[in-house]
Curated annotation (Swiss-Prot):
Catalytic activity as recorded in UniProt: (4aS,6R)-4a-hydroxy-L-erythro-5,6,7,8-tetrahydrobiopterin = (6R)-L-erythro-6,7-dihydrobiopterin + H2O
The family this protein is said to belong to: Belongs to the pterin-4-alpha-carbinolamine dehydratase family.
Name the UniProt record assigns to this protein: Putative pterin-4-alpha-carbinolamine dehydratase
Keywords of this entry: Lyase
The EC number(s) this enzyme carries: 4.2.1.96
InterPro entries to which the protein is assigned, alphabetical: PCD_sf, Pterin_deHydtase
């Protein structure tokens, strides 16, 4: 069975459309491979991360930005003083792709010691 490390070790593949989004069952199976807290709704996955202060929140945001740049797959992020909500979807196909789960796993790895 694939786990978070397997997903985090993968690289995103360019997606410019022309392929169908993941079926709900496929997305649910990939969701099980992520850390707890990720939610599947409305053709996207999201998770809210909490921190002690603004500095830690912004350090996390910058780390997510680095991952996104490396993978060329970018989430929507809503940032507050001590929270950051990260949402992934693949806009080019109007739904979820494996890239969304790969990046979510990489984000999870940022916080695993």
């Amino acid at each position: 069975m694939t786990n978070i490390c397997d997903l985090a070790d993968r690289k995103c593949k360019p997606c410019e459309g022309g392929v169908p989004p993941l079926r709900k069952e496929e997305a649910e199976n990939l969701l099980k491979q992520l850390e707890q807290g990720w939610q599947l709704a409305d053709n996207r996955i999201s998770r809210t991360f909490s921190f002690k202060n603004y500095y830690q929140t912004m350090a996390f945001v910058n780390a997510v930005a680095w991952v996104s740049h490396q993978e060329d797959h970018h989430p929507d992020m809503m940032v507050g003083y001590n929270q950051c909500r990260v949402e992934y979807t693949t806009h080019a196909i109007g739904g979820l792709s494996e890239n969304d789960f790969i990046c979510a796993a990489k984000v999870d790895m940022l916080l695993i010691s």
